[in-house]
Amino acid sequence: MPIVRLKENEPFEAALRRFKRTIEKTGLLTELRSREFYEKPTAERKRKHAAAVKRHYKRIRSQQLPPRLY
C-alpha cells in the first residue's frame, strides 16, 4: 500500500491529494473494483475481447479521413 508522510506545515488536504494521486498511479482502485465480485473466466475473456474490439474500431475511426461536407 502506498505510504504518504506528512511534511512539516503541510495541510491535510494536500497530503490527501498526494495519496489519491499515488493510489491512482499504482492502479489499486481499479484492481480493487475488479476483485470486488467474482467474475467467471469466460465472462472476463468476453469483456476483454469486447474492449479490444472497441479499441480497434476506435483506432480505425481516428485514422479515417473525415467525410466531405458539401
Swiss-Prot record:
Q: Which GO terms describe its biological process?
A: translation
The record's GO molecular-function terms, alphabetically, read: structural constituent of ribosome
Return the annotated region ranges for Disordered. 40-70
Basic residues compositional bias: what residue ranges? 45-61
Does the record carry Ribosomal protein as a key word?
A: yes
Which key words are in the record?
Ribonucleoprotein, Ribosomal protein
Indicate yes or no for the key word Transmembrane: no
* A cellular-component GO term for this protein: ribonucleoprotein complex
Member of which family? Belongs to the bacterial ribosomal protein bS21 family.
What PANTHER family does the database record attribute to this sequence? MITOCHONDRIAL 28S RIBOSOMAL PROTEIN S21, SMALL RIBOSOMAL SUBUNIT PROTEIN BS21
Q: What is this protein called?
A: Small ribosomal subunit protein bS21
Name the species this protein comes from.
Answer: Bordetella pertussis (strain Tohama I / ATCC BAA-589 / NCTC 13251)
